[in-house]
From Swiss-Prot:
It comes from Enterococcus faecalis (strain ATCC 700802 / V583). Substrate binds at residues 122, 154, 191-194. The lineage of its organism: Bacteria, Bacillati, Bacillota, Bacilli, Lactobacillales. CDD domains: AdoMet_MTases. It catalyses: guanosine(46) in tRNA + S-adenosyl-L-methionine = N(7)-methylguanosine(46) in tRNA + S-adenosyl-L-homocysteine. This is tRNA (guanine-N(7)-)-methyltransferase.
Length: 214
């Protein structure tokens, strides 16, 4: 998700180190210590303006959430939500999703959310897709054995690619929704993108895939 540059975003986020983690590599293997409890850790890669991860954290205080995004201005919008209504179980990281092993220890994360990731439709950009095998290999390292990825998109091509990528990697496809908003799925929290696309009548796809413990 791209947004207009927000003047002063860096200075704004620096004022709230209790929410936006500075030097996240020093918390590798110690995220539960950072949260002050032993609750499960769920992360969202590409958390955008933060609606999904914020509402999840609000609905599930028994789980620790971490929203990850590289874009400074957009992460500052997610921070707005925490400043207005603080939650003790949500942290924000401005880091690259390709380098997660620098910030999380092996088997430290319980679940990964991928919501409306960039589809990178051109074949030459396949390696940039967050469901490409190299990203899955990184995800598998930081996830606990039998850890899961929950993936949502409006892009049918990316969805079909991701189902294939999960299967080729050896993951178990637990559940699939080909039209999420017209299904019996309960508790769905919409992202900003999801609300925009669904209001146009676009179908939303969802899958839950699990790594197989080795």
């Amino acid at each position: 998700m791209r947004v207009r540059n927000r003047p002063g975003a860096a200075e704004y986020m620096a004022k709230y180190p209790q929410y936006v983690v500075e030097g996240p590599e020093k918390w590798q293997g110690k995220w539960q210590e950072r949260f002050g409890n032993n609750h499960p850790i769920h992360i969202e890669i590409g958390s955008g303006k933060g609606r999904f991860i914020y509402e999840m954290a609000k609905a599930h205080p028994e789980i620790n959430y971490i929203g990850i995004d590289m874009q400074l201005s957009i992460l500052s919008i997610a921070l707005d939500k925490l400043v207005a209504d603080p939650l003790p179980n949500l942290q924000l990281l401005r880091v690259d999703g390709e380098a997660l092993t620098e910030y999380f220890a092996e088997n430290e994360v319980d679940l990964i959310y991928l919501n409306f990731s960039d589809p990178w439709p051109k074949k030459k950009h396949e390696k940039r897709r967050l469901t490409y095998k190299n990203f899955l290999a990184t995800d598998e390292i930081i996830l606990k054995p039998n850890g899961e990825i929950h993936f949502k998109t409006d892009n049918q091509g990316l969805f079909e690619y991701s189902l294939s990528s999960f299967s080729k990697y050896g993951m178990i496809i637990e559940r699939v929704w080909l039209d999420l908003h017209n299904s019996e799925f309960e508790g769905n929290i919409m992202t900003e993108y999801e609300e925009k696309f669904s209001s146009r009548g676009q179908r939303i796809y969802r899958v839950e895939a699990r790594f197989v413990a080795k």
